[in-house]
Structures are given as C-alpha cells and as structure tokens.
Amino acid sequence: VLWDGEWYIRGITAAGRRIGTAADREGRVHMESNAWAVLSGVADPERGKKALASIKEHLFTPYGLMLNAPPYTQPDDSIGFVTRVYPGLKENGAIFSHPNPWAWAAACVLGEGGLAMEFYDALCPYNQNDKIEIRQAEPYSYCQFVVGKAHTAFGRARHPFMTGTAGWAYFAATQYMLG
C-alpha cells in the first residue's frame, strides 16, 4: 500500500486517497516518508536503495534535500496546511533543514556512506560559505529552511538557529556516519 514502485508515498487521506504517488501532479515525492521507511526497518534493502535514489533524483539540490517535489500550487484541504504554503518555502518544497539528517542516517543504514556524505555536505552551512551572496545567513548556523527550487530566491537561508537541525545532525553524524 505504501510502496509506489520507486519510493514510499507520504500518506493516505481520510477519504483513502494516496498522497505522494508517481501519478500526482504536485507533491509527488516526499523525503521524510522515504528516510523513515529505511530507518524504521519497513523498507527492505532493495526498496530502501530505490527510495534513496528517488530522493537524490527528485529532491537533491546544492543546498540540501527538499521536503517534497514538485511543490503544491493549489490548496487541498484533504492534504492540509502544506498545500497552502507558497511553493519553495518552508514545508512546501523548501530544503527544510531539520529532517535532512534522517536521510543521511538512512543512507548509512543501507551502506551508502558516500551518498550520506553528499547529502551532509550539501546542507552543511560551512560548505555554503562560497555562496554567501545567495545564502545570506551565518556560515556557522543551520537555518530552519533554505528556499527551494520553485522560488525565485532559491538557495537563500531563512531563520538561523530556529531549528532542531544541529541536534539531528550531531546524532546522524555520530551514531550513523562515524559508525
């Protein structure tokens, strides 16, 4: 029910409609459901690797992983709030920093250390220092989110320090990436 052939769906509405399927025009791929399918043990290695490949193909940017793509452009009350957020901001197609480390850890669970490092390096504030004119935030702070591809300010970081990213990054790095 949750596997869609290349990735795990986001969820199911109260009316039974699947969210995050290949057939969806908006909100087709979601990062969190795929990372947690691996971390929870629901995904077998074959599906887990396909899910991570889909994350990389559809959600990876030079600034980190977007939460979903393509972003929602039409409000849909059956899905909820995310469909009312401007495309490319916050929960709707932005690089929301807090859950990015879940994908790093998931890659490590599957033995994909190189992929975990690629994801890590993209979000790491220090590694974005040469893009400061775009990022416009401190090079030592994770930010709540980085504006996603669908927005004209793609790559601009927002709300420094207002995030749980540092704790999750530390956990993913020390408990998964370093062994």
Regions found by a protein language model. Give the residues of each.
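Acidic, mature catalytic/reactive cores of soluble proteins
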Residues: 1-179
